[in-house]
Regions:
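Conserved CoA-thioester-binding segment of acyl-CoA-metabolizing enzymes
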Residues: 1-64
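Residue-level signature of transmembrane alpha-helix interfaces in integral membrane proteins
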Residues: 42, 76-77
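Short Cys/His-rich "knuckle" micro-motifs
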Residues: 67
Length: 77
């Protein structure tokens, strides 16, 4: 299996003590939101809501170009 064939998850979730860090992981598309991102962020927020030990949630974007470009217009069309 080649590196290109390995699909990365659209959203990464990491626990840092009492903080849940949600990373939108689509830097090649400026982290724009498609169906997988929407579901992944929603699931992570639900996870945080159900965990009494989570005191804060941080949402960030992968890469160094942008946080999130908005909706993925290519996925919508």
């Amino acid at each position: 299996m080649t590196e290109a064939a390995v699909q990365q998850p659209a959203v990464l979730v990491e626990r840092r003590d009492d903080v849940l860090v949600i990373t939108i992981n689509r830097p090649e598309a400026r982290n724009c939101v498609n169906g997988a991102v929407s579901i992944g962020v929603g699931d992570a927020l639900e996870q945080a809501q159900l965990d009494a030990d989570v005191r804060a949630v941080v949402i960030t974007g992968a890469g160094d170009k942008s946080f999130c470009a908005g909706a993925d217009l290519k996925a919508i069309s």
